[in-house]
Amino acid sequence: MKTLGRSITIQDKPNAKDLEVKQGVIEFKDVTFAYNSKNVIDNLNLRIRAGEKIGIVGRSGAGKSTLIQLLLHFYQLKQGEILIDGQNIEDVTQDSLRRNIALVTQDTSLLHRSVAENIKYGRPNASDEEMYAAVRKAKAEEFIPQLTDLRGKSGYEAYVGERGVKLSGGQRQRIAIARVFLKDAPILILDEATSALDSEVEAAIQSSLDDLMQDKTVIAIAHRLSTIAQMDRLIVLDEGRIAEQGTHEELIQKNGIYAHLWQRQTGGFLTEQHPIKKKEA
């Protein structure tokens, strides 16, 4: 929410139209973005297929988070264009753009409101039954009934405290995941979604994230490579350019940047991978 709720200086064009997403194809075409006269993203070309799950990998400062901020149209490009289903994001309303993109981040900032209000933040007109269904999918139904606040409210009516301070890190992430399940946007961004959690909690939440990724176009950023190694394709950024791309196995064989990062994190050991579950046709 911190990213989606930030102050935006870019204004809609006078004739901006609502974004219509029927497939979820994302294209970065000759994209260049500069900060302090330095190209952070440098002539980048990337096409993400409808329903494809990709992981963005790279050393600190490679441009991973900048790429996400550009997709959300927080900044103006120096060059190029970003298309969603063939529609330039500069030509659509920002509200419609962000309605079609859901975000789970490392720093889950919740409102100082009730659990229910936080879950319905992305879709305020949702029914309680729809909210309960999202909570079950996020596996948050176990702890919510036990929550209480100083006003004497409990469960879904309990206030979570400023930035969700009354909840554990795992509980905050489950509320955030329930919110995204309820929003049901066709494009999903996971930005270090589990990096702040311990291994046991991370493993439990990863199952919910796998369910969340079904039938969506997904872009995931993670420093912990084992959490994204099962993606359809991994994109390795280096100084704002695509240095490598392929599956985990292909990149290990290339023995390049990705293989070096993997070796450093795992000591060469392969970790068990859990493919993203696909819905049966």
Model-predicted segments: where are they?
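ABC-type nucleotide-binding domain
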Residues: 5, 10-13, 19-281
